[in-house]
Regions:
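C-terminal motif of bacterial Sec signal peptides marking the signal peptidase cleavage site
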Residues: 13-16
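Residues within mature, well-folded domains
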Residues: 18-97
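Positively charged n-region of N-terminal signal peptides that target proteins for export
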Residues: 1-4
Length: 97
């Protein structure tokens, strides 16, 4: 009986995974347009960013999620968006594996 309970509690840990960041729907990345898409549209599409920062005086938002699995490899996707002084997308970069 003790062996069974040990297996029941340890098995999920063996199959476990870890996640860092905040998942986001990457389906709308194709709709981002430089000098057109606004911060409000980005929030509507992706939610609140995982990180906010500043790059050369411009607002920069990062959407990032990394998922590690005990069995398998790392799943990762990231979207970095730089906004101009009118709160429109100046540039962006999306990567996933």
């Amino acid at each position: 009986m003790h062996y069974f309970l040990l297996v029941v509690f340890l098995f999920p840990l063996w199959l476990g995974c870890a996640t860092v960041g905040k998942d986001f729907d990457s389906g709308k990345v194709k709709d981002i347009q430089n000098n057109v898409t606004t911060q409000l549209e980005i929030i509507d599409w992706f939610g609140v960013p995982f990180k906010e920062g500043n790059e050369n005086g411009y607002t920069m938002w990062t959407y990032q999620v990394d998922k590690w699995k005990v069995i398998g490899e790392l799943e990762s996707k990231g979207l970095v968006i730089l906004f101009d002084d009118k709160n429109k997308v100046k540039a962006y970069r999306y990567e996933s594996n």
